[in-house]
């Protein structure tokens, strides 16, 4: 039996090879940066507003500077969950509503597949180094300024 490009088997194999090959490129492609603020605190956040960037997130990163993070911008407000597969850093994630108010903060351990979910429908998730929110005394109800202008970027 000859394989042609019209073969469903070959299409699946080619799609799989291309998807696997794209992961390192996505991990290396820069995400846009934005500045967020919470009272006197300033955060420089990479913006993961596309499905590809949200899938890669902070995977394979070995360090992250203080007051830096990653803001996940979701297309819909719902109960999103995060996990730590292939993520080497311990992180804390704050789930945020449409206005940028923290719904809940979850601590996440590296290279685990435990789900960490928003307590209520969330539009954003902000990942920071483990303990960052607690060290700053930030909890549910605190507003993070700057996220609301990014909602339209999600795709």
Question: Which functions belong to the PLM regions below?
Answer:
Residues 2-14:
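Bacterial N-terminal signal peptides that target proteins for export
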Residues 15, 25-26:
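Cleavable N-terminal signal peptides
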Residues 28-155:
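Compact, glycine-rich, soluble single-domain proteins
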């Amino acid at each position: 039996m000859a394989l042609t490009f019209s073969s469903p088997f070959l299409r699946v194999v080619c799609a799989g090879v291309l998807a696997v090959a794209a992961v390192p490129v996505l991990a290396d492609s820069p995400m846009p940066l934005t500045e967020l603020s919470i009272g006197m605190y300033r955060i420089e956040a990479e913006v993961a507003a596309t499905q590809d960037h949200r899938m890669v997130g902070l995977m394979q990163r070995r360090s992250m500077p203080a007051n830096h993070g990653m803001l996940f911008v979701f297309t819909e407000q719902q109960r999103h969950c995060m996990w730590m597969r292939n993520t080497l850093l311990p992180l804390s994630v704050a789930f945020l509503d449409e206005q940028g108010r923290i719904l809940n903060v979850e601590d996440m351990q590296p290279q685990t597949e435990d789900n960490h979910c928003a307590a209520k429908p969330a539009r954003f998730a902000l990942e920071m180094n483990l303990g960052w929110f607690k060290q700053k005394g930030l909890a549910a109800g605190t507003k993070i300024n700057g996220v609301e202008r990014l909602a339209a970027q999600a795709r």
